[in-house]
Amino acid sequence: MSPRVYRISVLLSVLLAEVPVGTNLGLFWLLWALISGRFLLSRGAVFPALAAGGLAADAVRRSGAALAYGRWAVQPLVRAWQQVVEQEGRWRAHRYEGFRPVACDLVGFFRPHLSGCVGKHYQSGAAKALPAIVFAVVAAVGLVGKVRLPLLRLVLRADPSDCSEAVLQRRALRQAGAALQSDEVLVVDAGFGLADLLTEGVPCFVARVARNFTARG
């Protein structure tokens, strides 16, 4: 096993240490397929991506079952990743005038033929909103060496009972704002309303607004 492969295996094992036995192995192979780029080759299809990695058919089925029915959640994995990166001490947060930026945005995975909880997300190429599974992503901005690396902090999916982006945005702002340190500032683009930033109690933020924006303090 090459040092790089061994290193990735150790990191994945640390991230999955608190996941129940059985589910942890299934997620290990899923994350390995994701890191290796096999999901790009399979266009997001789970079973072909796993099979392309050389897994036996029964291992592919167990890994797919871990994804769909296993006892796990995204946020504990995100927290584990954040702790690992910070403990290694190589990641450095960007600072501007003493403040550390924390970015917040919505990301859409476009699935026009998927049934179920599918919202809509604006796609610039189509110049309109298209059916998509929408996530809110919050990440601290920093670098490792000379390479910029966002340190993921929060991943939220729309509530199945209400897939609107507006509701998801407010949830993201509320949770991201509550987790900000005294020297951190939340950075959002024009898709986030100033009223929502204030209503959800974000203590410090930088927002992109329209050129003709007017405010009164």
Locations of the language-model features?
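Gly/serine-rich nucleotide phosphate-binding loop at the start of the catalytic core
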Residues: 1-68, 73-74
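A generic secondary-structure signal
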Residues: 52, 87, 175-179
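Generic hydrophobic, aliphatic-rich segments that mediate packing or membrane embedding
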Residues: 45, 59, 98-102, 134, ...
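Active-site-proximal, Lys/Arg-enriched surface segment
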Residues: 35-36, 68-146
